[in-house]
Design a protein with these regions (language model features):
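C-terminal helix caps at helix-to-loop junctions of PAS-family sensory domains
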Residues: 16-17, 147
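PAS/LOV-family and closely related PAS-like sensory domains
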Residues: 36, 45-49, 54-100, 107-109, ...
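Sensory-domain boundary capping and coupling elements
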Residues: 101-103, 120
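Sensory-domain boundary/capping and coupling elements
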Residues: 4-8, 127-145
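Short hydrophobic secondary-structure edge segments in sensory/regulatory modules of signaling proteins
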Residues: 21-22
Length: 151
């Protein structure tokens, strides 16, 4: 078995990941959109590349998103570091998706900030199951009795 060059191998990993891998430049324009992003959000790479991140950020949180995004582009620092973040997203068909993601600042050889990469995972089904489980537990426990209340 012959190993491929690292660049080719990295490209194959990005292309075949079931997670969305997205790169956006300093202006928030999508420059990379893999097959995982296509599956999660419903946009093909041809549709998404060249568009802003607004296509996946719900309108209700866009202002806050862009404030943070441009602050990071200006300062070159993200307060989230290696944290796993949770946010709602929006699909092409308008439906909501629950996402967990991490971000990395991407710089060129001279250290100039090029933009941000994000790896996103659809956790909608897991969150729905967790909510259903909590509702079942609450129903089984019944109304909580307060100390000193009549039985």
């Amino acid at each position: 078995m012959t190993m491929e060059p690292a660049d080719s191998l990295c490209q194959r990993i990005v292309e075949s990941s079931p997670d969305a891998i997205i790169f956006s430049d300093q202006d928030g324009i999508i420059r990379l959109w893999n097959a995982g992003a296509e599956a999660i959000f419903g946009y093909t790479a041809e549709e998404a590349v060249g568009m802003t991140l607004d296509i996946i950020v719900p309108e209700t949180i866009r202002e806050r998103h862009w404030e943070g995004y441009y602050r990071v582009m200006k300062t070159g620092v993200t307060k989230y570091g290696k944290d796993m973040l949770s946010v709602p997203g929006i699909r092409k068909d308008g439906s909501r998706v629950s996402l967990e993601f991490s971000v990395a600042l991407i710089r060129d050889e001279d250290g100039v900030l090029l933009g941000v990469s994000a790896v996103l995972r659809d956790v909608t089904v897991r969150w729905r199951k967790e909510r259903e489980l909590k509702e079942r537990i609450a129903a089984l426990e019944g109304p909580a009795k307060k100390p000193g209340s009549p039985s």
